[in-house]
Amino acid sequence: MKILFHENQLSYRGTSNAVYNYALFNQEYLNNESIIIHQKNNKNNFGPAIEKFKKKFEVHSYSNLNEIDKIVSDTKSDLFYAIKAGKIDGVESKNCKTAIHSVFKYYEPHGDVYAYVSEWLSKEMTNGVAPFVPHMIAIEKTDLDLRAELNIPKDAIVFGRHGGDTTFDLPFVKKLIIEISKKRKDIYFVFMGTNSFVFKSIFTPYKNIIFLPKSQDEIYKSKFINTCDAYLHARQQGESFGIAVGEFSIANKPIITWANSEEKSHIDILGDKAVLYTNEIDLNDIIQNFKVDKDKNWDAYSNEFSSERVMDKFKSVFID
């Protein structure tokens, strides 16, 4: 069976990583063939991400929606899979079965199968009537970290975050990080793929606030996670699933997250393992009094979101 996987852009972001993993394990676990299709001129295309896909899959790009069905026919695809916001946008096929995977709070059923990316989103939008296929959480394993490379002491407490460049967006969290960094030199904040919100100078070097570029290197990402003692989440929108949250969670890192976000799939999955804050006072107390507890089980994702369990669900919802 051939599945044509559509993503608007091939990027550093979570949906592209999700598509990569679905396509990879569609081949390795379900023994199907995976082909990739994306928008040629999308401004969010990321060169290293495109190259990563090309190393594993046949990759097609298009400029106009009417090219999709030609690519479906040319590749002899049996299923057209599209991950998208959830709106009717013309991204579907008339030439084969179409599976729509909705990542946001929309309910505009189209295609042959319309499913959400989390149980929380299905409940939120359809009281659980619509099916859901979650993302899988799979990262490369290494025992190495980046502390020596980044000049971070072994005994320092490190709060980390990776994700979309503009989605670390709670102003009071940014303000608090700057304030704490001035007083607590034993606390470090390390961000990967996140726009800097700190003005550094010779007078205010903020050596304990570090911004790293985004990376497609899975081992480097694993080293980054190992560098951190906890994940600091500060996204107003929240998460309809939360891949980065899951990657830290399976590495047994506590997740510190805002309780009042609009989308709460990550909070739903974390349950009592979530470390919640509602305001600056809460977060200041959490950070200032944080103690590393490696004996506690912080992992809320490994059991439900392994590649095998997710692909079994993918097959039952989208393929069968």
Give residue spans per PLM region:
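Short hydrophobic beta-strand element within catalytic cores of glycosyltransferases
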Residues: 254-259
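N-terminal strand-loop element at the rim of the active site
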Residues: 7-13, 20-67, 195-198
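Short alpha-helical segment that forms part of, or immediately flanks, the ligand-binding pocket
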Residues: 222, 245-250, 264-265
